[in-house]
Amino acid sequence: MVAKKNRARQWRAAGSLTALLGVAAQPAFGEAADVQTACGPVNPLESLRQQYPGGNPRDSRVFIDADRASVAEEGLSVMRGSVVVRRGSTTLLAPELRYDGSRSVLAGESGLTVLSDALDLQAQVGRLAAERGEGRFEDARFYLRKRVGRGTASTVQTTEDGPSRLREVRFTTCPADQGDGDWYLRAQDVQLDFDSGQGTARNAQVVFKGIPLIYTPWLAFPITDERMSGFLAPRMGSSNDRGLDLSVPYYWNIAPERDATFTPRLMSKRGLQLQSEYRYLGALGQGVLYNEYLPNDQILGEDRTLWSYRHQAKPAPDWQAKIDYSSVSDIDYFEDLSTTLNRSSSRYLQRQAALGYGGPQWDLFFRAQDFQLVDPRRRGEPEPYQRLPQVMARTRNPQALAGPLVYDLRAEAVRFGRDGNRQGERLDAELGVGAAWDRGGYFARPRLAYRQTQYSLIDPVAIDGEQNPSRGQPIVSLDTGLRFERDVDWATRPFLQTLEPRLFYLYVPERDQSELPVFDTRLPEFDFLRLFDTNRYVGADRQGSANQVTTAVSSALRDGETGAPVVEATLGRINRFTPSDPLLPDEEGAEIGDSTNLAEAAAYLGADTRARFQIEWDDDEQTAIQQVAEVRYQPEPRKLIGVAYRLRRDLGEPLEQVDLMGSWPVTPELAAVGRWNYSLRDDQDLESLLGIEYRSCCWAVQVAGRRYVRNLDEVDQGIYLQLELTGLGRLGDGIQSFLNRAMVGDETMP
């Protein structure tokens, strides 16, 4: 059984009911289905393949080689000593065989080995109808050829074209030296249909460590790497808000490029939810349609739904199209019902249809966009304005005019709307002309631009102003810098040191913008590149005035042989010659002489350790506005120890958080993962997670406990369990993606 791959949908963990009903193999389109942990051969007959390669499967002739042969009676021959029988791609090996020529039947009573395209086996007793390709073998050990798996059977019946039938079967994917294995599937009757890639078992039990986990009268499982329809592994978890949470997905392999999954999800405190997902891949693109429906929530007493549709396509060279639509029935949906971390921390659901062009000279972008608020902590807040539609165009790079002269153009047209609020249209364009001198050791880029923004407001009442306000501002800038480098030796190692001082002057005259609405403009997070922006805002509703000089210097120490960075550091400062008035709510203005200071540093202590520090400093307040400090040690992909600190005082809700994360193998089989996210400002744990994973050759178990803040005064917690039986079930990427997120950490920290 193989569960779905690359489906970061939900992290409900699976319980130990690994083979509850039937099991489907569903990798992503075009991907392999399953790979077993390498720790010992499952098929000991693999070494015979080179010595006895199979022939043409369509060749029905029978070839027999033996050291000795004798005719015991009329029509009956006896062959002894390394007997080899070949028919098509099937080879039969035995120390002794009897051949009944009248019926074309070969029979042996000790040490039989059969090698075929689909199934290898060893048996004590066997008969093979050579001309028909039918066989019956008793007291047999069998090994799948197209998928990891082996087992024993009291009887194996094979046919040339039809399925193989096995009686009193024990099947496992554990290595051959483990006997029955740590786990096995026990069934009275098993049918292996290699044409469909499916095995079916009747009166079956899944036994783990000698303990029967589940009994089912019928079970389907994959015997090749091809996808197949059937039940996926169940997922099970528990939380305060949902109680016991059990899901049993059914996978429908419609076609190679289309599939669907239907999932009943039982929550003891909420009721029965139905989930469905349809995926497709074709010439017009690929997409996913997803739905959740919970009739009559037992706590709220109302129906609750989720719809999601995503589509991506490349309709022509250099063009891309995208549709992304999601909708829920109420603002509390993800808090109450979702166990996917990125969903439960979402503020808005986005709905958009977009078309983009990226050519050698121009970029074009068309979009219609809407949002739905899904964060209960912001209940009552207005949603972002709709963009219905938005059209943008810009030159990809400055385009040549004459000599060193270049020009650039950026334009945007957008219509904003929001229920109960004013609507309007905005046209924004900026044309710049400049020069670019770059001689390697220095550069100079003077630029003169003019930015014009025009509005047409459908409902300007809230402003008590005109219906068509506008703003026009020239923008003058000069960006210059020097580049130095030198070779240095330290501790007998060669290094390359770089030094890059930079000077950036910006002048933008002040304009009265009080008549202009604020549709989508905000102050961004500050970083080094923001020192050289011509506007301190993101969005066209506000253009900041400026008469300022940015001085900055960057330096790096790089490995002289590989060029890999060892230490990087940057200092930057904005000195203002004129005051800048606040243009957004909750924004503070800047006076003459006020400065913005930024420092960044990163150290790479070998290939395993990275330290990063960033601070934005306010001279006037003598305090940090933003600050980030982080140290990460990661010698291998699954080994990580990290600590991060973050401070932001420029937000409507300031934050100060510390984040500790780690993942480490305790033994080759046992690994632990944990994360602790703490708010220093609120003196509160935001999220605590501890998980362990034990992984052997053919099975793995993951256990995790999580406690997290849903709202400032509401905490949820849960315990999650997932069992993986290799070959019968990799139980989705539910709890695994949950643990991966904790291991990787969140560098940006919400």
Identify the meaning behind each predicted range.
Residues 3-16:
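Bacterial N-terminal signal peptides that target proteins for export
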Residues 14-25:
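Bacterial N-terminal signal peptides
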Residues 27-32, 652:
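Boundary at the C-terminal end of the N-terminal hydrophobic targeting segment
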Residues 30-56:
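Compositionally biased, proline/threonine/alanine/serine-rich low-complexity intrinsically disordered stretches
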Residues 35-37, 65, 113, 119-138, ...:
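Outer-membrane beta-barrel proteins and related beta-barrel translocases across Gram-negative bacteria
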Residues 47-59, 64-66, 80-96, 109-120, ...:
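Interaction modules related to DNA damage response and DNA replication/repair
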Residues 98-99, 106:
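A low-complexity, Ser/Thr/Gly/Pro-enriched, surface-exposed linker/loop concept
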